[in-house]
Amino acid sequence: MNSGSSYEAMERYLEKNKKPPKALFISSDATAAGILKSIREHGFLVPGDCNIVTYNNTTFSESSTPPLDSIEVYLKESAKEATFALERFWNAEKLPRKIVIPCSLVIRGSIKKQENNGK
């Protein structure tokens, strides 16, 4: 999904539901750009009315308004593990059942902490 199609999708969502979802996990910054534009054009706040986390932590996440919280993915390590898995496969070696590649959450300001209110 790109910025234009995500904008149109959020426009349809807001037309039907009259308010944005409380939170969105968005798979790319290009998608986030369109969604963020639509939400703001309707007068809703990010964070507040809608909280957003993106995936990949590109420069858009850092430079957008507001700066977006994002999952930092370590592509070098992912590529290295994929290469090792392919080598094992080609050599008819047993492949690991699970490969865990760390990631981290970069906090910038697109998530509003919810008040507990004693609950």
Language-model regions: role of each:
Residues 1-5:
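Short beta->alpha junction loops
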Residues 7, 11, 15-118:
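Flexible loop/turn connectors
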